[in-house]
């Protein structure tokens, strides 16, 4: 069993964040009081492995410099963490294609730009 609160804290810690960095919990249509949401998360245990999805698929957490959304594949669930203010390159590079013919390749890999700036 996975505890939703513990899972959330673990993901935050991996990214050097804490519960104190959370600014919003809910969905794009529903805001939940943060303290009440955290208390409910502490009481929420679920099977994160394969099977049926148990946690709301539109649950999200927005915080200082990040957003977390629920990921799911075939019933397996997790938090997706995305930095909202990433340090991005300032130098433009020539790109010839967005499409890969090898599958699961990066923009840099498709355009032979690995390791450069």
Region locations from a protein language model:
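Acidic interaction surfaces
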Residues: 1-117
């Amino acid at each position: 069993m996975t505890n939703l609160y513990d899972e959330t804290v673990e993901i935050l810690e991996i990214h050097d964040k804490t519960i104190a960095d959370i600014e919003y919990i809910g969905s794009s249509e529903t805001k939940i009081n943060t303290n009440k949401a955290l208390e409910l998360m502490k009481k929420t245990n679920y099977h994160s492995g394969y099977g049926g999805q148990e946690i709301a698929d539109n649950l999200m957490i927005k915080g200082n410099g990040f957003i977390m959304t629920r990921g799911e594949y075939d019933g397996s669930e997790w938090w997706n963490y995305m930095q909202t203010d990433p340090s991005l390159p300032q130098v433009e590079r020539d790109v010839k294609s967005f499409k890969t013919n090898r599958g699961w390749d990066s923009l840099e890999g498709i355009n032979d730009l690995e390791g450069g700036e």
